[in-house]
């Protein structure tokens, strides 16, 4: 082995020596390519010797009794062939997960990237926000590069990671030089320097998806099989959403439509499923290339952030705004990665099941929002009626759980009223403070239109949004209880998504009705319902990761219920002043809708086993 390595080194250096004589005659881009090749070859030769020496010493230590027939006598005295050992491991791991399962899960993981473009269907960016978005994109890309470097170091030699970083930076610099030589570049109706930057950003994010796809494939082929692969897939799917947001922000800040931004965000993640399947089938081979690939993608992103993305951000926003946006983005991404890492290092099958089930808790509010918007558009429901519906539902949600606790003697009247008063006081104080601050700013600006969202920011709209915030806090408290229950579900109780979705349906209806009545925008109503739907799963996942129990959750729930009452009292007062009859009818409809949904949830839990582990908060 050493003789072959020396011969290979001599041949390569002979060729390089002759090639160097012609470098002076080459173009500048060719010189860079030769330099990149030279750097790669030098590190390759060094690592070849190091790996060969490590392999020999490792074999001597691991199997000193090795015979000439490739038979190894292990520590237990059992004689096995190396071929049988390797084939046995591969057969064992591949029998656990099918190729189609890996392909379907990774396709869904890649599609999650498109969710990052959803906000731009409802928001138009002014120049200052475009600069802040570029700062956020820079933070996301930097955080992704940190994770790539760490992942590469975990899979092999740090030398390959360093080589990949340098090679990636050199590669992206050469690509920029080549694009500039072609003159004006156009893409998605963008021309000139902006088009060049868009091409580079999309290309870099696509390159870095190769490493993530191979990592997912290798995780499915690991010793823990499907459970480990599922957790890694879910982690990267959640991780893909802010990365899709980063790509969409770069595109939207340059005038690209939301549809195209979503399409290109998904395209940047398509290498994940394309690489995951081969990586699953050839896990050992892909593991050896991961360190260089992750370092290469990290080097590309670091160079692009410093050379292109941040300078563009500084043109539109102040340095403090850009720095704050980038820092918050990095901190958020690293916090997300830390949570998933801690979970994957110490988990069991129950946690994995609860983690997966928790993602489905948002279906109820989303369906409620869709139902409300469809009804409002079809029957041309008036604003007063819609606000009355929202208030009626909120009053039922605010009183349902406190009455359960009181009637079951799990909480006394005085503590219950005290917690409701605390929630109401906090809600009133927060709403009053925000309305006063916003009112002073409006009086100085002399405008009632927000240039960022194009939605009227009148007192009516602000009160409606604050009321939706109270519903969000209620969903968060309920999600904590669901997260405690999800890992303990058994039998048909694993399907408690049915009662939970039915329980959450009036919440989405209330939010969509409130927003639609205030803004007359079905886009905003659906977005608000979807956002409230996300609060429950995120809260449930957080409780699983934190490992909390039921103690104290009823108190949090009662405080959240108290916050609903004053918020929607203002909404119903406004609806009655606008049109007394329709506001009153809407409130009655809302009360009836909420009572019917919650009663049916109770009946499902009483007469089916779907709620055998669900908390009382959703029964």
Curated annotation (Swiss-Prot):
This protein's record includes keyword Transmembrane helix: yes
GO terms under cellular component: membrane
Transmembrane segments: 25-45, 102-122, 129-149, 155-175, 198-218, 230-250, 261-281, 289-309, 354-374, 383-403, 405-425, 465-485, 528-548, 552-572, 585-605
Gene Ontology biological process terms from the UniProt entry: zinc ion transport
Localization annotation: Membrane
Topology with respect to the bilayer: Multi-pass membrane protein
Keywords annotated in UniProt: Ion transport, Membrane, Transmembrane, Transmembrane helix, Transport, Zinc, Zinc transport
Domain of life of the native organism: Eukaryota
Main location: membrane
One GO MF term attached to the UniProt entry: metal ion transmembrane transporter activity
Similarity field: Belongs to the ZIP transporter (TC 2.A.5) family. ZupT subfamily.
Function: May transport zinc.
Name of the protein: Putative zinc transporter At3g08650
Species whose genome carries this gene: Arabidopsis thaliana (Mouse-ear cress)
